[in-house]
Amino acid sequence: MSRVKGGTVTHARHKKVLKAAKGYYGRRKSSFKVATQAVDKANQYATRDRKARKRNFRALWIQRINAAVRSHDEALTYSRFINGLNLAGIEVDRKVLADLAVHEPEAFGAIVAQAQAALAA
């Protein structure tokens, strides 16, 4: 039986890691051993930050909605506005509400008025 050497597989694996490390600084882009560690850590950060991005955007949307609600009525808070939306039966998510607040303030104002009416009733 002939001897099997893993040269092509090893070369392909090294090439894949070094390609992923392209743009890194110093030996992180050229040394396989250091590049492997750098790419592994980068993948850990990427996984963590995909989860964090969802939290960050939700927080941003809430801040934008709160600011827009308070610009329409100083006494109305974000939490009371969301309660008013639920009472009025308006099912618009925070992403769309934040987009309306920024790009179409008059439409957002109409939604605020409906929420206030539901709270008053």
Curated annotation (Swiss-Prot):
Q: Name one Pfam family in it.
A: Ribosomal_L20
Protein name per Swiss-Prot or TrEMBL: Large ribosomal subunit protein bL20
- Respond yes or no to whether keyword RNA-binding is given for this record: yes
Which GO biological process categories is it annotated with?
ribosomal large subunit assembly; translation
Annotated family: Belongs to the bacterial ribosomal protein bL20 family.
Could you say which residues form the signal peptide? none
Q: Report if keyword Ribosomal protein is assigned.
A: yes
Q: Which UniProt keywords apply?
A: Ribonucleoprotein, Ribosomal protein, RNA-binding, rRNA-binding
Q: What is the lineage of its organism?
A: Bacteria, Pseudomonadati, Pseudomonadota, Alphaproteobacteria, Rhodobacterales
Q: Which GO terms describe its cellular component?
A: ribonucleoprotein complex; ribosome
Write one Gene Ontology MF term: rRNA binding
Role, per record: Binds directly to 23S ribosomal RNA and is necessary for the in vitro assembly process of the 50S ribosomal subunit. It is not involved in the protein synthesizing functions of that subunit.
Query: InterPro entries given for it?
Result: Ribosomal_bL20, RIBOSOMAL_L20_CS, Ribosomal_protein_bL20_C
Q: Which domain of life is it from?
A: Bacteria
Annotated source species: Ruegeria pomeroyi (strain ATCC 700808 / DSM 15171 / DSS-3) (Silicibacter pomeroyi)
